[in-house]
Curated annotation (Swiss-Prot):
<protein>
    <recommendedName>
        <fullName>Large ribosomal subunit protein bL35</fullName>
    </recommendedName>
</protein>
<keyword id="KW-0689">Ribosomal protein</keyword>
<dbReference type="InterPro" id="IPR018265">
    <property type="entry name" value="Ribosomal_bL35_CS"/>
</dbReference>
<dbReference type="GO" id="GO:0003735">
    <property type="term" value="F:structural constituent of ribosome"/>
</dbReference>
<dbReference type="InterPro" id="IPR021137">
    <property type="entry name" value="Ribosomal_bL35-like"/>
</dbReference>
<keyword id="KW-0687">Ribonucleoprotein</keyword>
<dbReference type="InterPro" id="IPR001706">
    <property type="entry name" value="Ribosomal_bL35"/>
</dbReference>
<dbReference type="InterPro" id="IPR037229">
    <property type="entry name" value="Ribosomal_bL35_sf"/>
</dbReference>
<dbReference type="Pfam" id="PF01632">
    <property type="entry name" value="Ribosomal_L35p"/>
</dbReference>
<dbReference type="GO" id="GO:0006412">
    <property type="term" value="P:translation"/>
</dbReference>
<comment type="similarity">
    <text>Belongs to the bacterial ribosomal protein bL35 family.</text>
</comment>
<dbReference type="GO" id="GO:0022625">
    <property type="term" value="C:cytosolic large ribosomal subunit"/>
</dbReference>
Length: 63
């Protein structure tokens, strides 16, 4: 049986660590002037894939 191909869009969006899958943060790309500084601070930092989606993301990444 051949190897499963990685979903290339998922490979560009997610990074796999030891036990968690890191993802980018939404709401940080444009129209930033109207968003409060507190919200922008809270959007900084690492974000991880929710536990309910981990198996689907792993399947896309071939992990």
């Amino acid at each position: 049986m051949p190897k499963m191909k990685t979903v290339r869009g998922a490979a560009k969006r997610f990074k796999v660590g030891k036990n968690k899958i890191k993802r980018g943060s939404a709401f940080r790309s444009h129209i930033l002037t109207k968003k409060p500084s507190k919200r922008m601070r809270d959007l900084r930092g690492p974000h991880y894939v929710d536990g309910t989606n981990v198996s689907a993301v792993k399947k896309m990444l071939g992990v």
